[in-house]
Amino acid sequence: RAAVAADRGIIGGYGLGAPYGLAGGYGLEVPYGLAGYADYRYPAGACGIDAYGGIGEGNVAVAGELPVAGTTAVAGQVPIMGAVKFGGDVCAAGSVSIAGKCACGCGDYGYGYGLGAPYLY
């Protein structure tokens, strides 16, 4: 368990967390990663959601389930390894990329087998 939270473990500075992992400044997150927001110019109040107004920064590491009831607004990136299931509408401004096969059958080229190729939306 100590390796999970340690400096060089799964969540530490050289694992999945900041500053050099998947969620760090040089990984999938801003400003240099795949999900950089510099070119998207998100407008204030996008999707009917206004700015938070508070100041703060933090990391959330979840092993297992994270049930959320209500509305959750995220400004930034949410790197996910595994599966995600949404029930209802998902408001997204910017781009969404899916690497792998999704259950919607997209990319099955009309054969209906759901054997979709990797897609980038």
UniProtKB/Swiss-Prot annotation:
Entry keywords, A to Z: Repeat
Pfam families, A to Z: Chorion_1
Keyword Repeat: yes
GO molecular function: structural constituent of egg chorion
InterPro entries assigned to the protein according to its UniProt record, in alphabetical order: Chorion
Keyword Repeat: yes
GO BP, one annotated term: chorion-containing eggshell formation
Cellular component GO terms held in the UniProt record: egg chorion
Transmembrane segments: none
Role: This protein is one of many from the eggshell of the gypsy moth.
Family: Belongs to the chorion protein family.
Name of this protein: Chorion class A proteins Ld9
Organism: Lymantria dispar
